[in-house]
Amino acid sequence: MTTNVQSIKQMIEKVGHLSPFELKDELIHLAQKAENKVGRPMLNAGRGNPNWTAATPRQAFFTFGQFAVEETQRVWCEKDLAGMPEQAGIYERFKRYSEVYAEAPGMTLLKEIIEYGIQKHGFNEDEWVYELTDAIIGDNYPVPDRMLVQTEQVVKDYIVKEMGGNLLTSTHDLYAVEGGTAAMCYIFDSLMANRILKQGDKIALFVPIFTPYVEIAGLPNYDFEIVKVYASEVNEDGRHTWQYPKEELDKLADPSIKLACIVNPSNPASVAINDESMDYLKAVVEEKNPYLMIVTDDVYGTFCDDFKSLMMTMPYHTLGVYSYSKYFGVTGWRLGVIALAQENVFNDLVKQLPEDEKKILRKRYKALTVTPDQIPFIDRIVADSRQVALNHTAGLSTPQQVQMAFFSIFALLDQEETYKNQTKEICRRRKELIYAQLPSLAEKQDRYTTSYYNQIDLLVWARLQYGNEFVRYLLDHYHPLEFLFELAARYGIVLLNGSGFEGPTWSIRVSLANLKDEDYTEIGQAIGELFEDYATKWKAQGTTLSTIESEGKIESFMW
């Protein structure tokens, strides 16, 4: 297929400013045209949701749902109408049900889930089964609004374990929310509503980062001054390690920076902050900026070996966000939590507000309690999520909370971590398939790399393969987005631009989670072929194009 280079350049000029998630639609349009012309299916590796789902906890959920419906009909059954479940004796009724329907899908796990709460936490048998039964029926508002009592405890077990914490010392409270994206919205709104973050304040973003963090910060109602903390470390070969050098972390010593936002492991680099940087970051904040607020988004933590979250290593400073979407394949379920230690900087900053601002907040929350000053920040997030006045209807839907609990206990019961190792192996295998086609770029797997995405910096590749003259040629003759547009137009392959995540301008993101294994071989082949096509055109010119005097100067083009 012949690519109209001029039309691609015109298209980039028109849409190049868009978010990568909107730019993706333009790339899909090009890829679909290629699909029609060459008869090859489009490959969209721009999407982040995986192509696997956790089956057994879903089976347990739907089997338990049938039990719950029978419980409502036991109370009252009149044609299509039923009653509400009753607590007394419900555990024994469940045991009888599980014996009668012993072969029902997911029943073995379901019985283990029920027994987990009883054996691990000492839950009252009837109270535990009733909470789950009433919740899966969804006939009541969530009470408490932040999270169902026993459900919160089992979900906390999962969160603390996967985030590298200690259940014996963790004091985290959880707020169940509609996925990580809802958590982001709620958190920023509450920081502003409670006046511990104000319009125009200085915040730090650890980049590359999930694009909406950048876009939210620039919205007119926030208009934050952004300080970027770059994962700019490179190894001896000049390759990105996607770690944060000390000089970048030192930026947080500035006490005028009120908030730091981090995605860890990162998106799109998919690398967790290493232990050395975690320790250094903690020292900088505690010594130089003791009232810094941190929001860490750790959705990819389960794909990393021995992951440690800032919500566990720096609990006083850190508000944690976790989404179940990627690990369990539940982007459509909208399952996430906000986690905050009971002693935290957010509470203390609210207490330190001047009296005139405290009066405003007392008025805001006075309908909720006679002691509005004492409302913890996490409960303020809950109220703010429903404009305070609708606080009594706040909270994640109760059936969603049940599915969240089932996923959590399923993972906790998997002592051999069979499911976790499966998901890790899928991503790592697909990464190897890509690099089998790009041998000069092959990377070593280390324990900080998740391989959920892969970020390739085309300029680093160009320098490693052909030297600085080829880098200069690319800079002089191509727009950074041109590679992606040609990849879509010629091969029907959709990837995202790393620059849209505040990554290196010439970097591209490949999602390793959402296509079939064999598709990644094809993607690797296409990337390599297009790259070599650029190199062939450069070689054909037969002249030295480099205007760069030393390798050091080329570094300015790398980000």
Show the residue positions of the predicted features:
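Long, C-terminal catalytic modules of enzymes
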Residues: 344, 351-356, 360-417
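Conserved core of the PLP fold type I
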Residues: 84-290, 301-315, 319, 478, ...
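PLP-dependent enzyme catalytic core of the Aspartate aminotransferase-like
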Residues: 2, 11-21, 64-136, 140-169, ...
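Conserved glycine-rich beta-strand-loop-beta hairpin in the small C-terminal domain of fold type I
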Residues: 399-410, 417-435, 443-471, 501
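N-terminal glycine-rich, Lys/His-bearing helix-loop that initiates the first secondary-structure elements
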Residues: 1-78
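Short, flexible/disordered intra-domain loops and linkers
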Residues: 13-18, 55-61, 140-143, 233-243, ...
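Short, solvent-exposed loop/turn segments at secondary-structure junctions
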Residues: 48-53, 181-183, 209-211, 265-268, ...
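Active-site PLP attachment segment
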Residues: 51, 58, 311-377
